[in-house]
């Protein structure tokens, strides 16, 4: 028992004593943990602590968030792609923490300082006092301190002058692909364009815009992509690719042509004409005649055209392909057309050093002292008078010369001259060895060489027995007597004149023959002759079996003439061509036919011009294109498949059908029973009894219409040009109107009105007495002769339906254009219905019923 008590006492002492083993072990572990915590506190950065912070003397804690502790610029930078900044950025204050930085270079904390102070003590930090911050602010910062690394997409607004974000470092500030910067825009863009407006390809703006434009769309304002601006613009207009400017521009060095393809300028320019940056110099500059590499500034990117007057532009340069200049130039001695000027028209007197060395296209005018003119690179055309151009060089493909030359003994057209028109007397050494295109005039020399593809010769030749046209001559026009050995074996294009010899070989694709032939029995046109113009009497065996293009003249006994393979055109008189076959796509026939009952135009004849009397069986069933002439008894003419055009007089075409997309009809029709039901394009002439159906997309009607009560243009009529008169409607017309209106379809076009419910494009003409017209919804534009009426009363309180319930101009969908006379002041328009295009004279929007409604109510029609 005592032993048990002893064991218990030892156990209690060991367990609960002051120096017990568990207590010592716990104290030792606690001491080790305290030492570990102290060492960890000495090593770990402040950012490793949580938000609990440090315990102060008063028992409170100084709480700092992770954002305050994570400005360790290796781990706490901006991580989510700043997309867009819109607004104004000012200079940051001194005690502002930069949020977007990469690292701080040039600052090394001392070893004696706290790790926290060493990590965050930089200019603008919260851990520095005022004196340290002001002293550190003066230190320069590196380029890496001013960078966005996450692709800012767009900046729109005004940026001030910042000491923190310097101007020279702005390119580094937005480093990766800023998409667009657009300058200062006015808060409300209404009225005339401001000077600093930079848009995106403005297309069109015509007229004056109202000052107050809120929530409305009158005709004068085009919201997106205006096409054109016509009028007077402020000086500092800088756009992107302006297409056209018409008007007067004053002298201002800041707004004229930018460097992006100015197309057209028409007007008057004074002495301060600027082509590029710093182009105009107010002092005299001397320049050598041949110094092409001068420092003159000009149109750097292809100005197309200039029309006007230039007086003192000695240094004017069209260095890059100006197309055309029209006007007067007096003292442009140094005018440089060094890169492909296209055309010059006017008077030049003192241009001794005028340089057209690089492909000028055309010059028209008078030259007296241009001895050193260089046309060495493809001048196209010269028209005028030259007297002393001994050194004139057209060595590289001149296209055309028209005028008089007397002393041009050394004139060289050795490299592809295209055309020469005039008189030459002493051009013994004239060489057309390389593809001359055309010569018009008189030649007496025998040594002219046309061996290499001459295109055309027009004139008289007497002793040219050895002329060789063996290589693709294009055209010869004139008289030949002894040209027995002329070889046209290789694709001659055209011959015009008189020939008596029967040995001419046209076996290889002659294109055209114009003249008189008598005994050419063996003339072979077996391979694609294009055209014959003249008189033939005994050409019974002429073979046009292989795609002849055109025959013009008189034929009497050509019974076996075969046009079976795509003849293009025949012009002349035919009497007994009963077997003439146009079975395969003849294009055109012009002349008189009397007894051709079997004439077959079954396969796409294109055109017939002449008089036909008894062509009852004429078949135009397969896409005839055009018929021009007089028809009297053609009741069976079938235009069932897309006839394009008819020009002439028709009297009894009761069964005339243009049911499938006829394109055009020009002439007079008296009794036209069925209509042009499918997409007729154009009608020009006089119509009286209008049962014609334009139900499917008629394009155009030009002429006078009298009783068009049933005229229908329900689907996309494009244009009407003419005069329409209106008188009071009678009772029959009103009853008929009610029958039409009861169907509730906007497709009725009556005597005084044009209804085009779907995409009416244009109306040109005069419309009178249309006081009864009223607008419906969705009209985009209302402009008319209001006569100072209060248009603003037109509001949502007026119960105008969206379908047709009245007579008038109903244009509900996408009306494009109106051309005519419009009166009234358009500035006072205050509509709410997206007005498209409404025209009337006069017009009123009042709540009382219209004239037509009163007339309909008088007859019991509601």
UniProtKB/Swiss-Prot annotation:
Residues 32-68, 424-528, 549-634 are annotated as: Disordered. The modification Valine amide is found at residues 86, 156, 182, 190, 198, 206, 214, 222, 230, 238, 246, 266, 307, 326, 345, 364, 383, 402, 421, 440, 458, 477, 496, 514, 533, 552, 571, 590, 609, 628, 647, 666, 684, 702, 721, 764, 819. It comes from the Eukaryota. Its main location: secreted. Expressed abundantly in the abdominal ganglion, much less in the pedal and cerebral ganglia, and rarely in the buccal and pleural ganglia. GO terms for cellular component: extracellular region. Residues 1-20 form the signal peptide. It is found in: Secreted. Residues 43-53, 424-434, 441-452, 459-471, 478-490, 497-508, 515-527, 553-565, 572-584, 610-622 have a biased composition (Basic and acidic residues). One of its GO terms (biological process) is neuropeptide signaling pathway. The keyword S-adenosyl-L-methionine does not apply. Keywords: Amidation, Neuropeptide, Secreted, Signal. The keyword Signal applies. Residues 21-79, 90-149, 160-175, 250-259, 270-300, 311-319, 330-338, 349-357, 368-376, 387-395, 406-414, 425-433, 444-451, 462-470, 481-489, 500-507, 518-526, 537-545, 556-564, 575-583, 594-602, 613-621, 632-640, 651-659, 670-677, 688-695, 706-714, 724-757, 768-812, 823-862 form a propeptide. PANTHER family: PRO-THYROTROPIN-RELEASING HORMONE. PRQFV-amide may act as a modulator within the feeding system as well as in other systems of Aplysia. This is Protein PRQFV-amide. It comes from Aplysia californica (California sea hare).
């Amino acid at each position: 028992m005592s032993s048990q008590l002893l064991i218990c006492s030892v156990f209690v002492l060991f367990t609960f004593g002051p120096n017990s083993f568990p207590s010592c072990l716990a104290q030792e572990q606690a001491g080790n943990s305290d030492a570990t915590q102290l060492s960890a506190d000495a090593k770990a950065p402040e950012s490793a602590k949580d938000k609990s912070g440090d315990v102060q003397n008063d028992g409170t804690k100084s709480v700092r968030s992770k954002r305050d502790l994570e400005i360790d610029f290796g781990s706490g930078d901006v991580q989510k792609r700043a997309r867009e900044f819109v607004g104004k950025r000012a200079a940051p204050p001194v005690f502002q923490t930069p949020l977007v930085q990469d690292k701080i270079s040039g600052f090394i904390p001392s070893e004696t300082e706290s790790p926290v102070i060493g990590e965050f003590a930089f200019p603008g930090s919260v851990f520095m006092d005022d004196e340290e911050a002001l002293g550190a602010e003066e230190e320069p910062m590196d380029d890496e301190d001013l960078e966005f690394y996450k692709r800012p997409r767009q900046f729109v607004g005004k940026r001030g002058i910042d000491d923190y974000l310097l101007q020279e470092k702005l390119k580094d500030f937005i480093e990766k692909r800023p998409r667009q910067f657009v300058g200062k825009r006015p808060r409300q863009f209404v009225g005339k364009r401001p000077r600093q407006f930079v848009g995106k390809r403005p297309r069109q703006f015509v007229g004056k815009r109202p000052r107050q434009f809120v929530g409305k769309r009158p005709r004068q304002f085009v919201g997106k992509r205006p096409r054109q601006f016509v009028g007077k613009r402020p000086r500092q207009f800088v756009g992107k690719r302006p297409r056209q400017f018409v008007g007067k521009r004053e002298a201002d060095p800041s707004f004229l042509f930018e460097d992006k393809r100015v197309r057209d300028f028409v007007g008057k320019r004074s002495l301060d004409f600027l082509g590029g940056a710093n182009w105009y110099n107010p002092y005299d500059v001397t320049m050598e005649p041949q110094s092409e590499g001068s420092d003159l500034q000009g149109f750097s990117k292809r100005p197309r055209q200039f029309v006007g007057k230039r007086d003192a532009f000695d240094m004017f340069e069209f260095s890059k392909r100006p197309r055309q200049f029209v006007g007067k130039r007096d003292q442009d001695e140094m005018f440089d057309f060094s890169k492909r000027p296209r055309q010059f028209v006017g008077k030049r007197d003192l241009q001794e050093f005028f340089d057209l060395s690089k492909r000028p296209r055309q010059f028209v005018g008078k030259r007296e002292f241009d001895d050193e003119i260089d046309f060495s690179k493809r001048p196209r055309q010269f028209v005028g008078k030259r007297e002393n151009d001994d050194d004139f060089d057209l060595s590289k493909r001149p296209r055309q010369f028209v005028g008089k030359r007397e002393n041009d003994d050394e004139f060289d057209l050795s490299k592809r001259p295209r055309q020469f028109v005039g008189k030459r007397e002493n051009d013994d050494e004239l060489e057309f060895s390389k593809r001359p295109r055309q010569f018009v005039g008189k030649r007496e020399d025998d040594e002219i060489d046309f061996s290499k593809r001459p295109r055309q010769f027009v004139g008289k030749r007497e002793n040219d027995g050895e002329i060789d046209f063996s290589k693709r001559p294009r055209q010869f026009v004139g008289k030949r007597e002894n040209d027995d050995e002329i070889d046209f074996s290789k694709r001659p294009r055209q011959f015009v004149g008189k020939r008596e010899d029967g040995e001419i070989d046209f076996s290889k694709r002659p294109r055209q023959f114009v003249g008189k032939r008598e005994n050419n029995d063996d003339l072979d046109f077996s391979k694609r002759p294009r055209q014959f113009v003249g008189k033939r009497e005994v050409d019974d065996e002429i073979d046009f079996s292989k795609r002849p293009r055109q025959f013009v003249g008189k034929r009497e006994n050509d019974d076996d003439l075969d046009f079976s393979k795509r003849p293009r055109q025949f012009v002349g008189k035919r009497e007994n061509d009963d077997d003439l076959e146009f079975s395969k796509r003849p294009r055109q026939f012009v002349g008189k036919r009397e007894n051709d009952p079997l004439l077959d135009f079954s396969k796409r004849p294109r055109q017939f011009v002449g008089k036909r009397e008894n062509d009852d069986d004429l078949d135009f069933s397969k896409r005839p294109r055009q018929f021009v002439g007089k028809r009297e008894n053609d009741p069976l003419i079938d235009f069932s498949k897309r006839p394009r055009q008819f020009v002439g007089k028709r009297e009894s075409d009761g069964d005339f059908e243009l049911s499938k997309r006829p394109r055009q009809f020009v002439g007079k029709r008296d009794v036209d029973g069925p209509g042009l039901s499918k997409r007729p394009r154009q009608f020009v002439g006089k119509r009286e009894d209008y049962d014609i159906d334009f139900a499917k997309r008629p394009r155009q009607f030009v002429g006078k219409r009298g009783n068009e009560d049933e005229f229908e243009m329900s689907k996309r009529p494009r244009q009407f040009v003419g005069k329409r008169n209106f008188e009071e409607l009678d009772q029959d017309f009103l009853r008929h109107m009610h029958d039409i209106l009861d169907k509730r379809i906007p497709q009725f076009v009556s005597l005084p009105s044009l209804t085009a419910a779907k995409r009416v494009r244009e109306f040109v003409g005069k419309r009178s007495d249309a006081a009864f017209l009223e607008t419906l919804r969705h009209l985009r534009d209302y402009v008319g002769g209001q006569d100072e009426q209060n248009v603003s009363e037109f509001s949502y309180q007026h119960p105008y339906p969206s379908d047709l319930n009245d007579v008038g101009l109903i244009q509900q969908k996408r009306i494009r254009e109106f051309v005519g006379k419009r009166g009234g002041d358009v500035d006072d328009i205050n509509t709410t219905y997206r007005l498209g295009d409404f025209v009337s004279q006069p017009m009123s929007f009042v709540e009382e019923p219209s004239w037509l409604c009163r007339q309909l109510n008088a007859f019991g029609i509601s």
